Amino acid sequence: MKVDPNKEKALAAVLSQIEKQFGKGSIMKLGEDRSMDVETISTGSLSLDVALGAGGLPMGRIVEIYGPESSGKTTLTLEVIAAAQREGKTCAFIDAEHALDPIYAKKLGVDIDNLLCSQPDTGEQALEICDALTRSGAVDVIVVDSVAALTPKAEIEGEIGDSHMGLAARMMSQAMRKLAGNLKQSNTLLIFINQIRMKIGVMFGNPETTTGGNALKFYASVRLDIRRTGAIKDGDEVVGNETRVKVVKNKVAAPFKQAEFQILYGQGINRTGELVDLGVAHKLIEKAGAWYSYKGDKIGQGRANAGKYLTENPAIAAEIDKTLRELLLSNPSALASSASDDESTEGNIDLETGEIF
């Protein structure tokens, strides 16, 4: 198709004028001078990284993680911070709930000496701190825990029982408009933890909703629904949770995938257990009876012992992790088949044998 030369000249002139006024890169053709691959940070769970499609949470975007109480929301964000710090990135934690446990964070691998932490007095203060950190361009990951605890100043200064209809939603809506562009410019990942509330009078459909209005739902590139699906027992003692995360919204890859993993109390995500399960599912690790083998060498009797071997041999664990990422991220449907197989195995797991009961 022939293009009018006068239109081409006019377009070139206006593009030149826009770039002169707003800076180079302020407007461009979609396929030109930019990386089409989104930079990501690992969530600490291999199966969740694969379910997200891009290999982790996307930089320069807003992410919402929500779920019931004690489902692993804060643990998941601390795992993301630990993964980011291992890559040399700077992280900040906005603790609006005033409930961050530094000892637990340290156990999960977070470098608490280099983690920026703020406990703001009001919701506006928390969001202003987020915006200032973002505009600095020096912070790579910001976590806000939680949206429900971002209390507007008017509500704090008022009395208990006063009506403040829509204040939090209006505050969040204004913050999202301001933050979204700045996050993209500075390539900062902003994670909001959110709580669940019940809508009154819902007869059909899901009565669950998240706090803070609808703005966050629209601006978030990724929304994760995290749930506790069972307990992990060592004998009679409960030592962790079976956890399922569903990717409810995803703007960087296909949504609606889900991942299942274990969160062990005081340790975080059971990475080696995940490697054993996915390794067996994709024929990287051989299983004969209760024995697990890798490249012909026995690595342990029972899932727990195989996981312990990988913990003691990080080079082998890293090799299996790398192979699985290459396999699953190039072929995400492979995980879907293994996840559907895993769905029938809900329940309690004996740490010694790895058996479901």
Swiss-Prot record:
One of its GO terms (biological process) is DNA recombination. It comes from the Bacteria. One of its GO terms (molecular function) is ATP binding. It comes from Shewanella sp. (strain W3-18-1). It is found in: Cytoplasm. Can catalyze the hydrolysis of ATP in the presence of single-stranded DNA, the ATP-dependent uptake of single-stranded DNA by duplex DNA, and the ATP-dependent hybridization of homologous single-stranded DNAs. It interacts with LexA causing its activation and leading to its autocatalytic cleavage. Belongs to the RecA family. NCBIfam families: tigrfam_recA. This is Protein RecA. Gene3D superfamilies: P-loop containing nucleotide triphosphate hydrolases. The keyword ATP-binding applies. Pfam families: RecA, RecA_C. Keywords: ATP-binding, Cytoplasm, DNA damage, DNA recombination, DNA repair, DNA-binding, Nucleotide-binding, SOS response. ATP binds at residues 67-74. GO terms for cellular component: cytosol. Its main location: cytoplasm. InterPro entries: AAA+_ATPase, DNA_recomb/repair_RecA, DNA_recomb/repair_RecA_CS, P-loop_NTPase, RecA-like_C, RecA-like_N, RecA_ATP-bd, RecA_C_sf. Residues 335-357 are annotated as: Disordered.
